[in-house]
Amino acid sequence: MNLRLILRIARTELAVLFYSPVAWLLLVAFTCQVGFDFMNILTEIVKIKALGNTITFSVTAGFVLGLKGIYEVIQETIYLYIPLLTMNLMSREYSSGSIKLLYSSPVSSVQIIVGKFVSMVVFALIFVVILALPTIVMFISVPHVDITLILAGLLSMFLLILTYCSIGLFMTTLTSYQVVA
C-alpha cells in the first residue's frame, strides 16, 4: 500500500469534514458535555466534603470510573456523535459520482477505506484530547492521582470511538443514502 495516497485521502477527508459545520458543532457539543459531566462529578465530591463525610474511595477512581465517573457517562452517549461523522464517508462519494473517479485512479479500494479510516482516527484523537482536559484539572486539584487508571480510561475511550467509527464506515459503504448510513 502506498502510504502517501492513504495520507492524501485522509487529509482530503479531514478538510471536507472540517469545512462542514457538523464537525464543529459536534466538537462544541462534546466539549460542553465533558465540561458539564466534569462539574457534576466535582460538585458531588464537594457535597460529600461539605457534609463532613470522609471520602473512603479513591478520588481518581470516583472521577474516572464508577456509576457517575466521567468515562462512564461519556461512554453512554458517545454513540450519538459518531454516526453524524461517519454517515458521509462513502455515501457522499456514491451520491456525487466521485467514486467512479476514485476507482479509475491508481488507488485501490483498500487505500480509499484505510484513508477514510485514518481521518476518523485523527478525529477520534481530537475527542480524546477534549476528554483529557479534565484530567489536567485533576492533576492540579487532586493529590496522588492514579495516572495508569486515567490512561487506561482514555485508551479505552479511544478504542471505543474507533470501534464506532469502523462500524459507521462499514455501514456507509452499504448505501448511497446518508440517512440510511
Each language-model region and where it sits:
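Transmembrane helix boundary and interhelical loop/hinge segments in multi-pass membrane proteins
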Residues: 83-103, 117
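Hydrophobic alpha-helical transmembrane segments
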Residues: 1-81, 85-88
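Perimembrane helix-loop junctions in membrane proteins
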Residues: 41-48, 92, 96, 143, ...
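Alpha-helix N-cap/helix-start motif at helix boundaries, enriched for small hydrophobics
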Residues: 110-114
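Cytoplasmic juxtamembrane interface segments
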Residues: 1-18, 90, 158-181
